[in-house]
């Protein structure tokens, strides 16, 4: 990266990566970007960057990317129209602001990706996600750190975003993108990705988010399925495994960090001890990353060895998954629980539950609302008022915990169609086999969109912007041949 900056100028390397990195960090540190001021400031920033790049570079925008932008712009317009029949006009106005921010973000990321390619965009998102996750992990290991919120609730990691499942989603995105960047990367790139795996992996684990883990698996499966030179790519990406797994294993020796409602004194003491061990493991993983190919004894003529390593690794992961799950029968028995149960406060047991945590009632109400207004919906942002109308509800809910079901209920089939067009069209641009960066961007965005089907992570703008940047990189991958432009390559 440094050599590219010196040879080709900082603009071609830093600027395209800084845009998504700054957007993710700024929105996530503003409580996830969940207020009108954050949306308005972000919209102004995205529009400004878009205008400057269009004026200076005049990029060629791929047709699928244009359709993606048009889909989100149509959603913003349709949301504004729903103000006419909305039962909660003030909430609808807020949603219009959100859609304008989303549209401006997609347009900005598409324009930047069309000029500099997808690699800087992916790198910027990875940097932003790693920064946020590193801070989040420090708030757990150093609960007395100035600015740390301390231990709250059931001790699931959620700061600075404010929602644990959204933080898990951001960590998932960062892990998949880091894996893509590590493939065929220079030694210093592999080192950076291997080190980033530690805060990303710890953040994902400490959120105890089942949806984020499912999204990670789905995203990795998609990325591996479409990437070129699959065996070599898997081996290169495996440099992240030690950095992501070893610290999680270390934490098992410190129950105050993985249990609900721990004593503050225990958490302070155990967090400091865990931090020392984690830093030591990062040093070892960094050393190994610089010598990764040598450690794996790879060579150009070792095709059979590579195949057996990949198969053996996959089998080992399968066995570990079965052992960790504690048996399929036990897990299936949890489907009827109203919320996840875990004995002794051990949050690890939460990962073995299939409870919907109360989402069933929310989804049923959203479905009934859709059936009442199938074409145009009840008005954007009205679900919260609909849920609150029944005082017998056992808990409050501001969203329908499903991007697609909520869109159908509030904006009808018209809004749902626009949303699906905006989200699906970018994936049609992927040329299989795809480059590692495009495959990673596709996997990260697909994992996020899967999790958004049963959670309200879409409403956490900082994480949504990270996913939209990945989506824009995929949508722009066919423009001007910029499928995987590396730092220092001539811009389109």
Q: Residue locations for each model-derived region?
A:
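Aromatic-rich transmembrane-lumenal/periplasmic boundary elements in polytopic membrane proteins
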Residues: 135-146, 322-372, 376
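Alpha-helical membrane and juxtamembrane elements of multi-pass inner-membrane transport
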Residues: 155-158, 189, 360, 364, ...
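TM-adjacent membrane-interface loops and short helices in multi-pass inner/ER membrane proteins
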Residues: 163, 348-397, 404, 411-418
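Short, intrinsically disordered terminal tails adjacent to the first/last structured region
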Residues: 1-9, 479-492
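A generic secondary-structure micro-motif detector
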Residues: 64, 191, 356, 394, ...
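Alpha-helical transmembrane segments of multi-pass inner-membrane proteins
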Residues: 2-32, 40-53, 72-83, 94-111, ...
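C-terminal ends of transmembrane helices
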Residues: 54-59
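Interfacial helix-loop-helix linkers and transmembrane-helix boundary segments
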Residues: 60-65, 92-93, 114-121
């Amino acid at each position: 990266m440094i050599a590219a900056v010196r040879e080709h100028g900082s603009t071609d390397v830093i600027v395209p990566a800084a845009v998504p990195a700054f957007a993710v960090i700024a929105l996530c540190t503003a409580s996830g970007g969940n207020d009108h001021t954050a949306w308005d400031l972000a919209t102004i920033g995205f529009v400004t960057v878009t205008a400057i790049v269009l004026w200076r570079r005049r990029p060629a925008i791929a047709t699928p990317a244009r359709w993606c932008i048009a889909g989100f712009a149509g959603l913003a317009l349709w949301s504004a129209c729903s103000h006419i029949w909305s039962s909660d006009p003030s909430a609808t106005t807020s949603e219009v602001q959100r859609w304008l921010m989303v549209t401006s973000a997609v347009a900005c990321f598409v324009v930047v990706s069309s000029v500099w390619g997808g690699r800087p965009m992916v790198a910027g998102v990875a940097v932003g996600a790693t920064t946020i996750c590193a801070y989040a992990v420090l708030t757990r290991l150093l609960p007395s750190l100035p600015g740390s919120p301390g231990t709250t609730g059931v001790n699931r990691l959620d700061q600075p975003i404010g929602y644990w499942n959204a933080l898990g989603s951001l960590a998932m995105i960062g892990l998949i993108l880091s894996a893509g960047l590590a493939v065929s990367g220079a030694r210093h790139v592999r080192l950076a990705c291997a080190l980033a795996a530690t805060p990303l992996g710890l953040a994902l684990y400490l959120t105890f988010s089942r949806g984020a883990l499912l999204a990670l698996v789905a995203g990795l499966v998609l990325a591996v399925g479409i990437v070129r030179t699959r065996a070599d790519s898997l081996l290169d990406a495996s440099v992240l495994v030690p950095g992501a797994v070893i610290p999680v294993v270390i934490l098992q020796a410190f129950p105050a960090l993985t249990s609900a409602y721990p004593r503050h004194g225990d958490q302070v003491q155990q967090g400091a001890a865990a931090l020392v061990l984690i830093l030591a493991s990062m040093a070892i993983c960094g050393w190994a990353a610089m010598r990764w190919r040598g450690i794996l004894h790879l060579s150009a003529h070792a095709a059979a060895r590579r195949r057996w390593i990949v198969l053996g690794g996959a089998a080992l992961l399968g066995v570990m998954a079965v052992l960790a799950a504690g048996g399929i029968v036990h897990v299936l028995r949890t489907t009827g629980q109203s919320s996840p149960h875990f004995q002794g406060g051990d949050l690890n047991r939460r990962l073995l539950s299939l409870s919907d945590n109360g989402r069933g009632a929310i989804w049923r109400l959203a479905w009934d609302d859709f059936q009442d207004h199938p074409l145009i919906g009840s008005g954007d942002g009205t679900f919260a008022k609909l849920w609150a109308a029944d005082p017998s509800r056992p808990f409050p809910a501001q969203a329908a915990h499903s991007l697609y079901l909520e869109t159908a209920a509030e904006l009808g089939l018209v809004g749902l169609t626009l949303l699906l067009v905006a989200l699906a069209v970018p994936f049609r641009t992927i040329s299989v086999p795809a480059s590692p960066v495009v495959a990673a961007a596709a996997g990260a965005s697909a994992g996020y969109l899967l999790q958004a089907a049963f959670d309200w992570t879409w409403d956490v703008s900082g994480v949504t912007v990270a996913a939209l940047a990945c989506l824009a990189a995929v949508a722009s991958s066919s423009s001007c041949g910029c499928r995987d432009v590396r730092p220092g390559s001539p811009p389109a």
